[in-house]
Amino acid sequence: MKYFTEQYYKACLASAIDGALQDDVRAAKSEQAYKDQIWSQSFRAFLEQLDLSGAEETTPAVVQAKEQFRALVSSYVEQLQELLPDNIRKNVADWELLAMNHASPALCRQIRRFCASNRRQMQRISRAYESYYKKACVHFKLDMISQIGFHDCLITEIVPQLGDLFFAFAAAPAHSYITAMRCVKCDVIKDDGLKAGATWLYEEVYLVEDKYELQVLVQLPNGAISDFVLQAQRFEFRGSIT
């Protein structure tokens, strides 16, 4: 892929780190009592999102929510440690506080500059692809190609049949009217990420001789980022695979 690579995907994730970030002087150092206080506040907010704010702590739903919240914080800590550069990581006093969007003012300034840089990178890449697509699409059948947009959609099935390749998707708000795509007279060029259970992230479309080439970035069920490439004569869309 030339535009929407794994680096682009990571830039997208990194660009959002400062979305709910709060300047907090007390987050400049790690204090267990203060972290417990922020943890309690954040967990209450999480329960409100689940409509469990009035439930007893011992109810199964709240116990499950607590486990889920801990897992979310732990997962976000891992993501932050992967995305943030060394010059920012070394200034993090408490990773769990940061994962709950509390950081010292100095650290917040660093992170906001980093996020802004990633947003600019995303914009440059998006504009470059848009420029390519604007020129290329004069040769595309737009009524067909414009329907390919399965961003963040789960691929539930991949079925080869008589030279074609079928994809089934879980319904999603952005494209709930399409739950299946048929790639007619399909050749698989690269199959690394061609896995049922993967999440479709981004695609690039090209015309190679008399076929459309679809390059797709996916997230595999284990969280790894991969891609696949296929060429097809045309694409057909419908509500389900039959």
Where are these regions (language model features)?
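Surface-exposed, interaction-prone regions used to assemble/regulate multi-protein complexes
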Residues: 1-242
